Amino acid sequence: MGETPFWKTKGLEEMTGAEWESLCDGCGLCCLNKLEDWDSSEIAWTSIRCTLLDGESCRCKDYDNRQATVPDCIQLTPKAVREISWLPPTCGYRLVAEGRDLYWWHPLVSGDPETVHAAGISVRGRTVAEDGIDIEDYEDYLVTWPLEVGREPAD
């Protein structure tokens, strides 16, 4: 038997930088633009991706400098993960913060960064870049799929 995975034995604050970064499954969901209803505070998801999110790799094109280009980019920290209500239900950070295990398709579990895409979790092929889209038109891009958990592997 191997060692117990770090995400089952460490709190978010105890993780090394590399462990923390590896909790990201590469789905790209957190980089989708969202709308908030001012009256109810309800969050609605759009299929519009951040200008820095690569729609195929589902990774940031300039991760280290992202906040210089996108000032309202949210940097996830253990505190932020516990406070942000809109993190998708499949988010590795959210799952670990809630004391839950990672899904089968998470690269730390599967050993393959492509399983997040094969399971239908990621934004790959389902988004449009925000460049050139007026904020008034965002409602035309509302979607619910970011709240879905994904497909089980075929036997």
UniProtKB/Swiss-Prot annotation:
Similarity comment text for this entry: Belongs to the UPF0260 family.
Ranges in a coiled coil: none
Organism placement in taxonomy: Bacteria, Pseudomonadati, Pseudomonadota, Alphaproteobacteria, Hyphomicrobiales
Top-level taxonomic group: Bacteria
Pfam families in UniProt: CxxCxxCC (PF03692)
Protein name: UPF0260 protein R01011
UniProt xrefs under InterPro entries: Puta_zinc/iron-chelating_dom, UCP006173
Cystine residue pairs: none
